[in-house]
Amino acid sequence: AITTEADAEKKGTEMGRKHIVPYGLYRAEGFVSANLARKTTGFSDEDLQLLWQAILNMFENDHSAARGKMAVRELIIFMHDSELGNAPSYKLFDAVTVARKDGIAVPRSYQDYTVTVADTLPEGVHCERKS
């Protein structure tokens, strides 16, 4: 890299390069405790709906050249019939799979992936998908 004027004189033909990843698909997992919400924080169903909206739109008003075009593509929510939960979170997270579609060697868009949720979930749990 050219870092000084002396370097510039010696390395006049050197150009910088940035390595890029043309497309990346990130997965994030999180939790909301209904029991803690009721007992401690006062977190309401209205707050929960606002949280879902905030997650879905979190990059819309925060564009950055460093992050490229980041966007939340889908929110997969597991709802439990019981306040304490009907299944451990790891089983629910394991029910979500992301795979490249056949014939796609180098993904370039979200459409190059298939995101699925297992058809059978533990009793007392249902899935809601938002995009």
Regions found by a protein language model. Give the residues of each.
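Basic polyanion-binding and macromolecular-assembly surfaces
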Residues: 1-131
